């Protein structure tokens, strides 16, 4: 280690939304911006140009407001329609039942990064990008990070906020291959319903449509989870054939699907491994990657950042990291369990699916159950 005067308090590896939110929150909690370092392999311009759609919960909006990263261009979700294809029964979660302006919001990754980058800049946070961490050495009093330009950055604590982890593999890590691939695109419909999101369970996996205003005011962000071989077929179809397949899977609640953007895909799996050592900890995607059903991955990561910032604001010490691990167990366990159960329970065929479809209708009549699910989706386990 170098002289402690040159050692920063917290190095955050990964300047995605979760890493930047943590940095801005640490500054908000009183840590000097010059004592916080953000390290990322991407240039800021590359991150800002990312067109992916992301879902933010109402709780995440509150966090962004606190650090001056809200408002941003986003479409509000007022209600969520949940159904099972081919079976009776559906459930509706509505903002009017929960005294909030929206259940959540749909925005583009680049819009969120732009806002968070501005918050970090105003806080005077040190940003090192593009740069990769090629190695690390943990000492009793800190961690030395080796960067790809040959330099060394010394920190009291290191937070892995994206990608791999520094800590040892947790023997209780939960991994799962869903044998599903998510096909993503932006699509337009002939008769949209403003501010309504859909979660439609099919034999191969969930199909989500999230309202996202485009130039025609009729656009949705599509996340369609299917078997890998089906995903390959969908990617090869021309636009007309793709829209026809989508209409068959979703139904006619929004009229006809009239246009689609280019499509992309990514493999789905569960990897919940919140690895940690005395001076390193993983949050966000480095701690858990979830199935996209219910859109909880980023929001769970932002809750990680909020709790960690609160604790490290009391001191950048191993004791605070240990307390963080304990404090996040319940929310992580419930959110991971909920998304995993939903992804697996509604995929498949057979008589059980009819019962599951009917269960949505029963669920819709039980106000306390709907309220609990909405609370978990907006704020996590508090």
Residue positions per predicted region:
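Conserved FAD-binding catalytic core of PHBH/FMO-like flavoproteins
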Residues: 157-254, 258-263
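FAD/FMN-dependent oxidoreductases across multiple families
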Residues: 233-300, 306-318
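Glycine-rich FAD pyrophosphate-binding loop
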Residues: 25-51
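N-terminal FAD cofactor-binding segment of flavoenzymes
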Residues: 48-85
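Conserved N-terminal helical subregion
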Residues: 5, 75-170, 176-182
């Amino acid at each position: 280690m170098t002289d402690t005067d040159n050692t920063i308090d917290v190095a955050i590896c990964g300047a995605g939304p979760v890493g930047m939110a943590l940095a801005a929150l640490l500054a908000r909690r009183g840590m000097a911006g010059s004592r916080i370092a953000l390290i990322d392999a991407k240039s800021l311009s590359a991150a800002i140009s990312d067109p992916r759609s992301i879902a933010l919960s109402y709780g995440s909006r509150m966090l962004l407001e606190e650090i001056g990263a809200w408002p941003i261009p986003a479409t509000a979700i007022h209600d969520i329609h949940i159904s099972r294809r081919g079976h009776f029964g559906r459930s509706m979660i509505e903002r009017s039942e929960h005294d909030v302006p929206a259940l959540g919001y749909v925005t583009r990754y680049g819009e969120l990064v732009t806002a968070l980058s501005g918050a970090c800049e105003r806080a005077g946070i040190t940003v090192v990008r593009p740069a990769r961490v090629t190695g690390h050495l943990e000492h009793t009093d800190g961690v030395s990070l080796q960067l790809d330009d040959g330099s060394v950055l010394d920190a009291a604590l290191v937070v892995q906020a994206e990608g791999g982890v520094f800590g040892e593999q947790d023997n209780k890590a939960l991994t799962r291959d869903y044998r599903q691939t998510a096909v993503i695109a932006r699509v337009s419909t002939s008769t949209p319903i403003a501010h309504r999101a859909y979660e439609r369970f099919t034999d191969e996996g969930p199909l989500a449509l999230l309202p996202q205003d485009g130039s025609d005011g009729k656009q949705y962000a599509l996340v369609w989870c299917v078997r890998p071989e089906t995903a390959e077929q969908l990617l090869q179809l021309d636009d007309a054939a793709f829209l026809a397949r989508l209409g068959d899977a979703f139904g006619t609640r929004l009229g006809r699907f009239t246009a689609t953007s280019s499509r992309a895909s990514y493999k789905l799996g569960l990897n919940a491994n919140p690895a940690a050592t005395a001076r390193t900890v993983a949050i966000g995607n480095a701690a858990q990657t979830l199935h996209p059903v219910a859109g909880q991955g980023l929001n769970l990561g932002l809750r990680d950042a909020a709790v960690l910032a609160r604790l490290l604001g009391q001191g950048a010490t191993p004791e605070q990291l240990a307390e963080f691990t304990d404090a996040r167990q319940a929310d992580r366990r419930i959110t991971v369990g909920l998304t995993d159960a939903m992804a697996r329970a509604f995929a498949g065929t057979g008589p059980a699916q009819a019962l599951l479809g009917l269960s949505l209708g029963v669920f819709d009549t039980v106000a306390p159950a709907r309220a609990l699910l909405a609370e978990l989706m907006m704020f996590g386990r508090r």
